[in-house]
Amino acid sequence: MNLRKKDCKIAVIGTGNAGIISAIMTIYTYRLLNLDEPRLTMFHDSKVPTELTGQGTTLNISHAIEKIVCDEDLNNPAGITPKVGFYYRGWGKKNEKILYKLGENAMAYHFDPPKLRQAFLNKDLVDVIEKHVTPEDIKDDFDLIIDCRGKSVNNWDEYYDMPSPTNYCLLGRTRDGRPPEVWTEHIATPDGWTFKIPLEDGYSYGYLFNDKITSPEIAEKNFDEMFGMKTLHKVPFKGYLSKNYYDQKNKTLLNGNRLFFFEPLESNATPMYGIAVNEFINSVIRHGEKGAVYAKKKYQILIQETYQWVMWHYMYGSKYDSEFWKYAQDQSKNYKYSKHFLSMIDYVRRTCNWKKYVGQNEFPERIISEFDYNDYATWYFSNV
């Protein structure tokens, strides 16, 4: 496999969120390496519905979006909003509110997936073909195929089961102007937890619970009562991870929901989509086919630890002593974490200055817009 050659051709199957992120990260990786960009082709099948996904990133994806697509300036075609960290409300027993930054003065983005998709395609950086294809159909025409077709429902033997405390999500949306918050909120509820994402024109909500403990009908009622939110979509799910990240025979790298799905705590999916592409291309360019094997092993370890990171968040329960939280806490405490993960957690415990993160992170009452964000950032970073 030679991804360095000038006439390199890469295909992305699927133009949903994972497909778009894969294409963006492919271009971004080649530009960082100062290499000629490959001929990039995206295959779109309008008969396949796009999976409903979250809209949060961490630093790797945000840098790529800013360099390849757009930033907040010039009419903000991707609908991005700033994100400085995660705000936990009601998690654990000691502190009602905890906000932590992504890193010193670092900033990521929230985004509107349909807007990001269209903004990227409008750049004319890729060829888009409306056609249903499989990797086997096109393997002879491309040097690498990134398969983002979503999860097939009938091949569970090809995946590891990755259970989590939640298995169901109710989605809601407001459209009432730009919110003031610049963080993703994770709000504990008696049934589970809810994400609240500030977008350009309102909030995106996701009410997560376990349907073995709370019925969807009761959860829908509670979603409305707690957040004033009408359910737009009901999404049952299960956690899984593909046993084969890279198919050497068909030169195919899996990504998106074709590769894995975990519950959306800490916006884990989108950044992992970017890492999958970046790590693989970098390794293959440097080491050829051996690099593909190395990237596969490294990514499997990383994604396993991402899953452990999600599970660990339930370790100390929440302010609710509900059936769900007792179940979630037991599942977290009984999980067999890797030694490397536990050593990482121990290091964070010993070295982190938690006073920076607890009890002083309310945002100002005035509305924050893109025009006074710099003033807000100055206030924020002087108060955490």
Q: Residue spans of the language-model regions?
A:
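N-terminal FAD cofactor-binding segment of flavoenzymes
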Residues: 46-98
